[in-house]
């Protein structure tokens, strides 16, 4: 059974709690709104049509892999994991007051993490109604699980020992980000990269007219233009994957004050480092942060979110470009039976996947960039402004993952329209002014650039115009023949070779 649950917020259950701004002067309309607001369905079981966020509403099914990792329940699960890892490590530290745990107790504790369920999460939420403190609720829940085992019950005060809430939170954040990055974000991005690499190879030899400043320019190939994006994405992906995810467990202001008050001679820094860097499940598998205030500085998060945002910016650029290629007819989109493109124009086949991706990438970047700017800033030894922002990490990543899925779907619908590509090339003979003047320069023909400018700039140029000019040039006959054989479609340089390299 999965240990996560739905994340759909519940409307107020009392009819008179309908917001005044939604009330109508009409009794019938008002009663309808009250009826809509009086659902008694538990918040975690609401249908998606009642979700406030489209990530848990319209797009919920597309984010089923991310939800268990970045939801509040996922956050609770990681907190339990951190508390248990710290507790077990303390039992192995050699303290006379806390003997090593038996194998049975260790297995029991590890199973609390492994089998963490929706019911467990709801039990913690119930405790939080009394404590009004989410981390303390986790601590009390763990202690409640010790009641049936005297060995653990006697050691209950070592749960959350010497820890500040942020020791548990920051490591949980890092664990969430690690799993989300490695198990969801990067695999979704990899699918886009793989599909685009496949297209770059398939279309490596398909000539295409370039446009710089929106005007005709030296031809390329479709595959080479896709390869450009693939290389950018590969570089961006490697940066995301390489960022170390940090964790600190050093107390209320980062100095091990409480720890040393209990055992002054113990090497708490080395102990903390071991818990943080030992691979899961015995440790946390993170990178140790030795210097902090109450909170981990969040610099690694800023770096991670900036790296994801830069990747998204590359994909926004590509989404707009491929949208344009569809618009001018270089690509058509495969039809899907039953789909409708417009409520009034039956002929429409819109590039909705690329538009959806562009919009969601923009939303992701707005959040990611806010977090990368805000999170490294905290007043003195800490303030709470980071807490509410951090709860939106999953939202930011959710919009990014959603966009990657949309791009992958959109790319899979594309079919190349070679006739449109060829038509554009055949109407742009002026682009051969570049190779002609370059060969003229090789043979020291005076004013080569200026002569071609006079013939081509702002004019409609035909093959015959250029061929007449070529024949009149004082260059070797072999060079004339080479230039005469050239067409806009053949003048692509090493584009095909470059496309195949990626």
Model regions and ranges:
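Short amphipathic alpha-helical segments with heptad-repeat character
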Residues: 178-186, 190-193, 197, 227-230, ...
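Tryptophan (W) side chains
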Residues: 3-4
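A helix-coil-helix interface module used to build multimeric assemblies
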Residues: 37-259, 263-277, 341, 354-356, ...
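Glycine-rich cofactor/substrate-binding loops
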Residues: 37-77, 128-132, 329-331, 342-502
């Amino acid at each position: 059974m999965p240990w996560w649950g739905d994340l759909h917020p519940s409307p107020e259950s009392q009819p008179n709690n309908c917001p005044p701004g939604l009330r109508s002067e009409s009794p019938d309309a008002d009663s309808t709104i009250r009826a809509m607001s009086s659902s008694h369905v538990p918040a975690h079981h609401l249908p998606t049509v009642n979700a406030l966020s489209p990530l848990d509403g319209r797009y919920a099914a597309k984010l089923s892999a991310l939800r268990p990792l970045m939801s509040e329940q996922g956050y609770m699960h990681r907190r339990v994991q951190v508390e248990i890892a710290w507790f077990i490590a303390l039992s192995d530290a050699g303290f006379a007051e806390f003997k090593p745990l038996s194998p049975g107790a260790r297995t029991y504790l590890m199973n609390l993490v492994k089998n963490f369920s929706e019911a467990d999460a709801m039990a913690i939420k119930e405790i939080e109604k009394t404590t009004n403190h989410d981390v303390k609720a986790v601590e009390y829940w763990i202690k409640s699980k010790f009641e049936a085992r005297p060995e653990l019950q006697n050691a209950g005060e070592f749960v959350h020992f010497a820890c500040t809430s942020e020791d548990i939170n920051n490591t949980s954040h890092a664990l969430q980000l690690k799993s989300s990055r490695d198990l969801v974000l990067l695999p979704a991005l990899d699918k886009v990269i793989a599909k685009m690499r496949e297209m770059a190879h398939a279309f490596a030899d398909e000539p295409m007219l370039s446009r710089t400043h929106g005007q005709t320019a030296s031809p390329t190939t479709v595959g080479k233009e896709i390869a450009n994006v693939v290389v950018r994405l590969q570089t961006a992906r490697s940066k995301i994957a390489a960022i170390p995810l940090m964790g600190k467990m050093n107390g209320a202001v980062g100095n091990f004050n409480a720890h040393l008050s209990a055992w002054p001679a113990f090497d708490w820094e080395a102990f903390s480092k071991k818990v943080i860097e030992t691979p899961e499940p015995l440790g946390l598998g993170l990178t140790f942060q030795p210097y902090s205030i109450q909170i981990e500085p969040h610099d690694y998060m800023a770096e991670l979110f900036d790296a994801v945002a830069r990747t998204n910016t590359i994909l926004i650029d590509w989404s707009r470009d491929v949208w344009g290629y569809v618009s001018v007819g270089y690509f058509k989109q495969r039809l899907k039976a039953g789909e409708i493109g417009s409520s009034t124009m039956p002929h429409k086949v819109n590039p909705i996947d690329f538009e959806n991706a562009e919009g969601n990438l923009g939303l992701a970047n707005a959040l990611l960039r806010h977090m990368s700017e805000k999170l490294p800033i905290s007043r003195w030894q800490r303030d709470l402004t980071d807490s509410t922002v951090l709860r939106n990490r999953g939202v930011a990543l959710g919009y990014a993952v959603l966009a990657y899925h949309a791009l992958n779907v959109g790319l899979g619908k594309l079919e190349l329209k070679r006739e449109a590509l060829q038509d554009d090339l055949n109407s742009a003979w002026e682009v051969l002014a570049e190779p002609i003047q370059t060969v003229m320069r090789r043979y020291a023909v005076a004013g080569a650039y200026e002569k071609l400018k006079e013939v081509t700039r702002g004019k409609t140029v035909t093959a015959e115009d250029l061929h007449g000019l070529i024949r009149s040039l004082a260059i070797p006959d072999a060079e004339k023949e080479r230039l005469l054989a050239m067409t806009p479609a053949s003048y692509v340089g090493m584009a095909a070779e470059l496309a195949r390299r990626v």
